[in-house]
Amino acid sequence: MRRIFILNLFFLISFMHFNSAFSISPDVFIQSTVNRASQVLSENITREEKINQLKIIAKETVDIKGVGFYSLGAARKALNDQQKYTYSNLFENYFLKSFSSRLAEYTNPEIEVKDKQILNSNYTIVNSVLIATNERPEVKIDWRVYTKNPDNP
């Protein structure tokens, strides 16, 4: 189960992206996103409300379509436009449900951004750690952030 969670987390973080209109660096973007999710999870609201708010955060920050097509691999080339459209919609629904319901189980997760490595003008790896608690071990998380406009990060 832990392996599946880490694999899903890898796919999520591998395709994080942000709009250049934010004009913030990738590490600040990640910390901001993490803080938003943590705030939702620590609120005294129903699980359903947490799930709905986490879905909004995911839609704003994750390239869900990119994750879906990456998951298809070479099979993507065999699909026609209608099949790609249908798949994208189904994958988005699956991703949002899986991501938000799994994350909603956490209460006040603390993720600390440690470092960043600029790979090129468009990609940055942001290193962070999910702080250990009595219930879960420390988990290292590397986020691959895509900057659409390197001149205005």
Show where each model-derived region lies.
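Boundary at the C-terminal end of the N-terminal hydrophobic targeting segment
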Residues: 21-23
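Residue-level signature of transmembrane alpha-helix interfaces in integral membrane proteins
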Residues: 18-19, 96
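Bacterial N-terminal signal peptides
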Residues: 7-17
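Surface-exposed, charged secondary-structure patches
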Residues: 97-142
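Positively charged n-region of N-terminal signal peptides that target proteins for export
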Residues: 1-4
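Early exported N-terminus immediately downstream of N-terminal targeting peptides
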Residues: 25-103
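Short beta-strand edge/turn micro-motifs at domain boundaries
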Residues: 138-153
